Structure formats: structure tokens, C-alpha cells
A protein has these predicted regions:
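Surface-exposed, low-hydrophobicity beta-strand/loop segments enriched in small/polar/acidic residues
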Residues: 1-179
Length: 179
């Protein structure tokens, strides 16, 4: 079984311009294969905000890392405490305000930043409920489908990014393996 980690970015605020919610990026010196198995979005907005149901969040691959802004380093948590530490040539962070150089977009979804609530029958409450969404699960149970992969000795990364109205915040969880 491959060594598995979860990288969790908590409370990342939305931005009116492009925003990097979470990225995993490897330098060309990286010696491990990174495979993205699952990605979750969690609407973490708890206080009442004006209903906002417009905006998109995407998953894409990048040839250069996002760099603008002041990113927050994400320390991944190993699923097995016997796993070796993540390679120092792998960077995991969130909060950048400018994307790196995009190569591919794998998925784009609409996402609402309104607080999830079921107490009223407003459209935005239905749009943001459930508050947790699995947005990438390809290749986890089906060995015929490859997960998102960053090959060893290749500079590149996978990024969860979007353009939303600057209201609310989100958590992002990325489950990945290293081999």
C-alpha cells in the first residue's frame, strides 16, 4: 500500500480575483511520484453573509507554482505514522493570489460561499448544502483510471483555485499518495 497523506487547508478566504485554495507542487529534484486521490471542498462559512451563489472553483495542473501573496504552508498528515516525511522538494500551501502557469484544467464547478443552513427555503441555502463536497475521486477504487499524477523528477503541480465573490471562506482537503 502506498504511503498516504491528507493536506488540509482550513479557513481560506475567497477572493474576487483568482485565488489558490491549495496546491501541491514538486521541483524537478523531487524523487517521488505524487498521486492525487481525492479532493474535498468544505464550505466553512459559519456567520451569516449575503447570499452568493456565483463563482467557480477548478482543479488544474501547473508547470510553475503559484507565488504571489503570502501563502500558508500546509503540513500534511500521514495516514500511517510509520510513513517517512514528505520529500523536501514538495511544497504544499494555500492562500496565493495568483496562479502559476496553467497546463490543463481537469474540472471546474460552480460553488456558493453562502453559509450552509437548512432552516429556510432559500435557493442559496440549498446550493451550499451539503457543505462538504467530494470533487475529485478518479482512480481511487478503479485501477483502470489514473489519479492526477505529478511524475518524479518533473517540476509541476496540481492546484485547486477559483474566482469567487470575496465573501466567506472554505476548507480544502487533498488526499494523496507518494511512491
Amino acid at each position: 500500500m502506498a504511503a498516504t497523506w491528507t493536506a488540509y487547508a482550513a479557513g481560506v478566504t475567497h477572493a474576487a480575483s483568482n485565488k489558490v485554495y491549495a496546491q501541491i507542487f514538486a521541483t524537478a529534484s523531487n524523487t517521488q511520484i505524487i498521486q492525487i486521490r481525492r479532493i474535498w471542498l468544505i464550505n466553512a462559512q459559519s456567520a451569516a453573509v449575503t447570499g452568493v451563489i456565483s463563482g467557480t472553483i477548478s482543479i488544474g495542473s501547473f508547470s510553475t507554482a503559484a507565488s504571489a501573496g503570502t501563502p500558508t504552508t500546509i503540513t500534511p498528515v500521514a495516514h500511517d505514522t510509520n510513513n517517512a516525511a514528505v520529500n523536501a522538494n514538495i511544497t504544499i500551501n494555500s492562500g496565493n493570489t495568483t496562479n502559476g502557469t496553467a497546463v490543463n484544467v481537469y474540472r471546474t464547478i460552480p460553488f456558493g460561499s453562502d453559509e450552509p443552513a437548512t432552516g429556510t427555503f432559500k435557493l442559496e441555502n440549498f446550493y451550499s448544502t451539503p457543505s462538504t463536497a467530494l470533487i475529485w475521486d478518479a482512480g481511487f477504487e478503479d485501477t483502470r483510471i489514473s489519479p492526477l499524477t505529478i511524475p518524479a523528477s518533473t517540476a509541476g503541480g496540481i492546484c485547486v483555485y477559483g474566482t469567487m465573490t470575496a465573501v466567506g471562506n472554505i476548507d480544502v482537503a487533498i488526499e494523496f499518495t507518494l511512491t
